[in-house]
């Protein structure tokens, strides 16, 4: 299969103790990790030190969609990688022959897992999602893009609260953000309701928000109300 044609660029956006691609995030990139926090730099060393080149010829497309990409990972977090291939079962068999632990998630998606040591000695659990779908359509890509946009929208206080919920209560990133935003139901589905929403007008009830001219905090998310 042809290798991933997308090569790293240079555009980065600062985030608390981390960096991630700015507007229209391209999760195929790795370069921004080298400029991030210690764990991001460690992940970059592993991925760019051979794993990306190892997987590239096997897949049509690759993207890192782990929370480490936006600085919301915890110790032990996986490096989640989307791998596009027209025949995921064939790719799974190829990876199994190379020592990966593989299993079927459904008829179209396979999972491959392995622990890898980077050049810095750090051991990372790596999880590959083998899919025939374009990567931008995958929930992992869509969730990460929304979470990055929300971090940019609400800044450091939001980032700190998400991390607090991740560490103190063990919540996934999606669940932590949905709690802070007051989104009910399945957090994986609830987060996707923000696709296409103008986040500039979105409020986070858990964070201070400037009052409008009527003394309310605007909360224009569909179904939301003006909060006194």
Where are the regions a protein language model picked out?
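Catalytic cores of NTP-dependent nucleotidyl/adenyl transfer enzymes across multiple folds
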Residues: 136-228
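Active-site nucleotide-donor binding segment shared across nucleotidyl transfer reactions
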Residues: 51-90
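Residue-level signal for secondary-structure boundary sites
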Residues: 89-91, 134-136
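Long, low-complexity, intrinsically disordered polar/charged segments
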Residues: 33, 68-77, 192, 201, ...
């Amino acid at each position: 299969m042809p290798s991933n044609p997308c090569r790293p660029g240079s555009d980065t956006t600062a985030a608390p103790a981390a960096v991630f691609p700015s507007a229209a995030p391209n999760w195929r990139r790795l370069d921004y990790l080298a400029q991030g926090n210690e764990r991001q730099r460690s992940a970059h060393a592993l991925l760019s030190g051979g794993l990306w080149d190892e997987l590239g010829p096997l897949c049509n497309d690759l993207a890192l969609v782990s929370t480490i990409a936006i600085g919301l990972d915890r110790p032990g977090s996986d490096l989640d990688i989307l791998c596009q291939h027209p025949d995921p079962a064939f790719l799974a068999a190829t990876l199994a022959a190379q020592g990966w632990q593989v299993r079927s998630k459904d008829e179209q998606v396979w999972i491959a897992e392995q622990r890898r040591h980077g050049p810095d000695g750090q051991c990372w659990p790596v999880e590959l999602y083998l899919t025939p779908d374009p990567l931008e359509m995958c929930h992992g890509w869509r969730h990460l893009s929304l979470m990055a946009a929300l971090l940019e929208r609400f800044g450091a206080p939001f980032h700190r609260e998400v991390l607090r919920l991740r560490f103190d209560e063990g919540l996934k990133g999606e669940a932590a953000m949905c709690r802070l935003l007051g989104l009910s139901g399945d957090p994986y589905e609830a987060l996707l309701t923000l696709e296409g929403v103008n986040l500039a007008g979105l409020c986070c009830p858990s964070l201070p928000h400037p009052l409008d001219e009527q003394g309310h905090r605007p909360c224009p998310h569909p179904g939301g109300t003006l909060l006194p």
